[in-house]
From Swiss-Prot:
Keywords: ATP-binding, Cytoplasm, DNA damage, DNA repair, DNA replication, DNA-binding, Nucleotide-binding, SOS response. This is DNA replication and repair protein RecF. Pfam families: SMC_N (PF02463). Its main location: cytoplasm. ATP binds at G30, D31, N32, G33, S34, G35, K36, T37. GO terms for cellular component: cytoplasm. Belongs to the RecF family. It comes from the Bacteria.
Length: 369
């Protein structure tokens, strides 16, 4: 799948613009602060209903405007075009429309337009808290396993009920036992989906990483969030007093982690910034391959400042891996000459110059594969 049209209004410093991007490679270039990243942010808003640059909405909406809007047309894997739109107001209200109908949640956007983001904050996948790696893992499971979302929603409901009881003690013993059983059942299903996904991801990740950098001792391992040799119900019972003292549930899939280690140590503590970027890129690209294999469409990749941290050899290797996915890619850079030789002659590449918030298409080369 790919975006065939994107219209942006009142997103940061961008002038109103409608783009007709290439179905494959799109390069947005210009000086720092020109608005290149804001184009990626607008697409991210369209696919996930939130910004990747700010937890707050106000900075995203242009000064003196009441709301920002992004519309897009997506060519789905079955060849049918789908129209998406989102409007977000300063007060936090948002409207999502898919093919003329109001959507119930951002999950419908994410399902229609799977997005992968690679930007300077991507290092947090290695350096950050386990929550970031759980989000990475669950994003992948969501896009290849249609049964995952309702089970995840059951898990969240059971966790909320149990944590509320731990803080306030307003459940009778029978109700507490029922919610513990529901939590345990949903947790086992989530664990099974995650474990299956990791088993599929690991060989694809290792193969992808080998194309970028030699790190033979780098390993992925999965911690499910509680003792692998014990049933969660047993763990919940034995940790009840401590859970009550803490006010929340200590064990379960909400404590899971994807551990990325090099020679037995936390990889983030050993790898250079360039190596970390390549590891993150390999993980994200591997996820794209799994979506392709599941025949659930293709990711759209947003790559902010691809050349940073990378020498020419690694830039070209990363370009080829993105190209080999056969998906749509949006890349920002200051100097387009750094990327001009990264693509095959028959790959359609569109170039967009961004200056003071104005986006203009400058070149289209190659032909549709």
């Amino acid at each position: 799948m790919s975006l065939t049209r994107v219209s942006v209004t009142a997103v940061r410093n961008l002038h109103p613009v409608t783009l007709s991007p290439s179905p494959r490679i799109n390069i947005l270039y210009g000086d720092n602060g020109s608005g290149k990243t804001s184009v990626l942010e607008a697409i991210h808003l369209l696919g996930l209903a939130r910004s990747f640059r700010s937890a707050r909405l106000q900075p995203v909406i242009q000064y003196e405007e009441a709301a920002c809007t992004v519309f897009g047309q997506v060519m789905l894997a079955n060849g049918i075009a789908s129209n998406l739109g989102i409007s977000r107001e300063r007060q936090g209200e948002f409207t999502i429309r898919i093919d003329g109908q109001n959507a119930r949640s951002a999950a419908q956007l994410a399902e229609t337009l799977p997005l992968q983001l690679i930007n300077p904050d991507s290092f947090r996948l290695l350096e950050g808290a386990p929550k970031i790696r759980r989000q990475f893992l669950d994003w992948g499971v969501f896009h290849v396993e249609p049964r995952f979302l309702p089970v995840w929603q059951r898990l969240q409901k059971a966790l909320r009920q149990r944590n509320s009881w731990l803080r306030h003690g307003k459940l009778d013993p029978a109700s507490q036992a029922a919610w513990d059983r529901e939590l345990s059942l949903a947790s086992d299903e989530i664990d099974a989906y995650r474990r299956s996904y990791i088993q599929a991801l690991k060989p694809v990740f290792e193969e992808t990483l080998a194309e970028l950098v030699s790190l033979d001792d780098l390993t992925l391992s999965y911690y499910r969030g509680w003792d692998k040799d014990r049933d969660l119900l047993e763990v919940l019972a034995s940790s009840l007093l401590r859970d009550q003292q803490m006010g929340h549930t200590q064990a379960g899939p909400q404590r899971a982690d994807l551990r990325i280690r090099l020679a037995g140590h936390n990889a983030a503590e050993i790898l250079s910034r360039g190596q970390q970027k390549l590891v993150v890129c390999a993980l994200r690209i591997a996820q794209g391959h799994l979506i392709n294999r599941a025949k659930r469409g293709q990711c759209v990749y947003l790559v902010d400042d691809l050349p940073s941290e990378l020498d020419e050899q690694h830039r070209m290797a990363l370009c080829r891996l993105l190209e080999d996915l056969g998906c749509q890619v949006f890349i920002t850079c200051v100097d387009p000459q750094l990327l001009k030789d990264g693509w095959r002659t028959d790959t359609p590449v569109s170039m967009f110059h961004v200056e003071h918030g104005k986006v203009s298409q400058t070149t289209t080369i190659g032909s549709e594969a």
